[in-house]
Amino acid sequence: MNGRGFEQDIASPRGGDVPLDPRSLKFPFRNESAKSWLDSQERMALLKNTPPIRSIDPNTYDAICLAGGHGAMFDFTHNSELHNLIASVYERGAIVASVGHGYCGILNVRLSDGSYLVNGKILTGPSWREEKLALVSQKVPYNAEELAKERGADYIRWKRPYRSSAAATNGLVTGHNNSSSGDLVASSVCEELDRLDSLKAKGSEPL
């Protein structure tokens, strides 16, 4: 995203300091991309003083991306301020994206017509099988895969667990897991932005 010249801001439900998941600081998650962030004082400073969701103006962003991790299941699922922001961003033709469990923050989002944003959309994210393999199925608050299907989403469940993949459809981009955040999700978001720019240039409405 930086290479394409996109500016990035980081917000959080309550604002302020955002702690990092200790497990994510270890192998295999501590890859070169993660190290570059941890070694950058400028980037780490973004996590120390984040604005709260309620202060974000949806009209000033071309895309919003929800970070993953199991904490998203607790922090995002029933956050009405986040859901209102996502709906506003999506309905004005901007991109909504997620990585891993970040898609839990999208599942309960309703659009102005009362429908669920994910209804009829292709999406992906951690499966229930993967939660069982990770021995956390008894610790998480719900089955996100099942909830996605209940909301009418066309959920993609890969045969091989933990593979890196992404799905993009009509302004919604979802990455299967945190390993999908780099080239896959970021590239898909850029492609969606290019597609929307092309439609706007032709005078067409985004789908």
Where are the model-predicted features located?
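Extended, subdomain-level signal for the structured scaffold at the beginning of enzyme domains
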Residues: 2-92, 96, 104-207
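Aromatic-residue-lined binding/catalytic grooves and analogous aromatic/hydrophobic interfacial grooves
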Residues: 100
